[in-house]
């Protein structure tokens, strides 16, 4: 005898926690690269973020009289914390990540009803708010430690995060100023501030674009690319969004190089600088805030690529992934409405 039950009659073993865990595993190579090139501050920021995220998820569960495991075990808050911690400068003051996690989880996630209800990517809401509110702290990226005369020790890293200075009394900006030829800490920052004075050739000859230094951001982006390809292979994310985002940006950047040569960094340098690969594979592909239709995913990814291009090339911010993702999130309901697959046998 067969037992009569309602649908669904088949079940998938893919739970939310499993998906989140795979995403975090895919981020580990990039996390290791960030720590290798920027030091212990990366791990300190991640530790603070994860600890606070778990505490907030437990508190929300108790306030809503839910089982603690209901909010913590799905790992969504933990993943949000990891993404935000890897997005901010490793030696930013501790209160930056504290404010960011509170904004991401309380304002951008749980105020909408929790997982699956939020309209905007929580980590990017927090990042954008931090960048606008605290621009000095959010642009305090150190150069890779190989270029520093005295790389921060573990004790220095703790001191920088919690007091703002090393044990010898040096701030992040003082450490950055000890490196000749560096105006800002990241390649995009340096190119944005130095392009008019030095030109493309002069920028590319600076320490930030030559030798091991240049390989720092390239290798971090390559690590994100490798992790993203793993997620596509495991069917954790779909290929349409990253392909459309990177393709649109590369197309527009390439056309700019042809029409206005020697005015901006080349396409490859743009693709492997900043948060491009991070955004394409780990941020834009958020299943809650991204488009859900096949054609919609292509449009959504293409929009992000377009916004990144416009802001990077013509805006005031050297990197633009956070703002681009949030702008595209606004368009998702409209995109999904007009890209619903046609039912078999129905008219267009």
Swiss-Prot record:
It is a multi-pass membrane protein. Its cofactor is FMN. GO terms for biological process: electron transport chain; transmembrane transport. Keywords: Cell inner membrane, Cell membrane, Electron transport, Flavoprotein, FMN, Membrane, Phosphoprotein, Translocase, Transmembrane, Transmembrane helix, Transport. Pfam families: NQR2_RnfD_RnfE. It is an enzyme of class 7 (translocase). The modification FMN phosphoryl threonine is found at residue 186. GO terms for cellular component: plasma membrane. InterPro entries: NqrB/RnfD, RnfD_bac. Its EC number is 7.-.-.-. It is found in: Cell inner membrane. The chain crosses the membrane at residues 15-35, 36-56, 67-87, 88-108, 125-145, 212-232, 241-261, 265-285, 298-318, 320-340. Belongs to the NqrB/RnfD family. The complex is composed of six subunits: RnfA, RnfB, RnfC, RnfD, RnfE and RnfG. Part of a membrane-bound complex that couples electron transfer with translocation of ions across the membrane. HAMAP family: RsxD_RnfD. This is Ion-translocating oxidoreductase complex subunit D.
